[in-house]
Curated annotation (Swiss-Prot):
Its EC number(s): 3.5.1.44
Domain of life (superkingdom): Bacteria
SUPFAM superfamilies assigned: CNF1/YfiH-like putative cysteine hydrolases (SSF64438)
One biological process term in Gene Ontology: chemotaxis
Keyword Hydrolase: yes
Stated name of the protein: Probable chemoreceptor glutamine deamidase CheD 2
PANTHER family found in the cross-reference section: CHEMORECEPTOR GLUTAMINE DEAMIDASE CHED-RELATED
Similarity annotation: Belongs to the CheD family.
Task of the protein: Probably deamidates glutamine residues to glutamate on methyl-accepting chemotaxis receptors (MCPs), playing an important role in chemotaxis.
Keywords of the record: Chemotaxis, Hydrolase
Reaction equations catalysed: L-glutaminyl-[protein] + H2O = L-glutamyl-[protein] + NH4(+)
GO molecular function: protein-glutamine glutaminase activity
HAMAP family to which the protein is assigned, alphabetical: CheD
Length: 201
């Protein structure tokens, strides 16, 4: 796939929404200047949807901070990991014509979906990091749906900046993604049962 469509992407045609779609898996990101539907499945991981309305460039990443304490100071390995995940996406968007000072964010995920989680909850750490990062970079958060006990399937329409969130019951597909990028899920929808709540923001 060419650079304009980003790296590590999985493209298909979504018959329901009648649009070219791209699945973004754990540890990946996708930037585009085309009308696309970016799709990901989240448990404790976080997805950041970025848009530059002027240039029409948009993108999404999907990441999980390494295990550790709640200390996310700039010098910690967890903070460096998170910053790198954000900078990879932003750099690709800039190559397509986006301006950093025009970026707007919508953030999702960080659900506490794993059984037997430690005192330091993974979702809380990811939430603290991404809010702090975006504040420091002066990137406004237009919408968010974070924490809670559910998994989420995220549909990001890059042409409009709109995001459809499907709240999911705990499922095998979501739980698998809580293992830090061990293996790939062939079908992100497999085993996921849609809950009662859909959000369109």
């Amino acid at each position: 796939m060419n650079h304009a469509e980003g790296m590590n992407s999985h493209q298909y045609y979504d018959k329901h929404f009648q649009i070219t779609a791209v699945k973004v898996f754990p540890g990946e990101f996708h930037a585009t200047n085309q009308s696309r539907l970016l799709v990901t499945l989240l448990g404790s991981c976080v997805a950041v949807c970025l848009s530059d309305r002027i240039s029409g460039v948009a993108g999404m990443n999907h990441f999980l901070l390494p295990e550790g304490s709640l200390d996310l100071g700039a010098g910690t390995s967890a903070a460096r990991f998170g910053v790198n995940a954000m900078e990879l996406l932003i750099t690709d968007m800039q190559k397509l014509g986006a301006m950093r000072n025009r970026l707007e964010a919508k953030i999702f995920g960080a659900g506490n979906v794993l059984d037997g989680m430690t005192v330091v909850k993974v979702g809380e750490r990811n939430t603290n990091f991404i809010r702090s990062y975006l504040a420091n970079e002066q990137i406004p958060i237009l919408a968010e749906d974070l924490l809670g006990e559910c998994a989420r399937k995220v549909y990001f329409f890059t042409a409009t900046g709109k995001v459809l969130i499907k709240k999911l019951k705990k499922s095998g597909a979501a739980i698998k993604q809580e293992q830090p990028y061990r293996g790939r899920i062939v079908d992100q929808g497999e085993g996921a049962k849609t809950g009662d709540i859909d959000l369109f923001i």
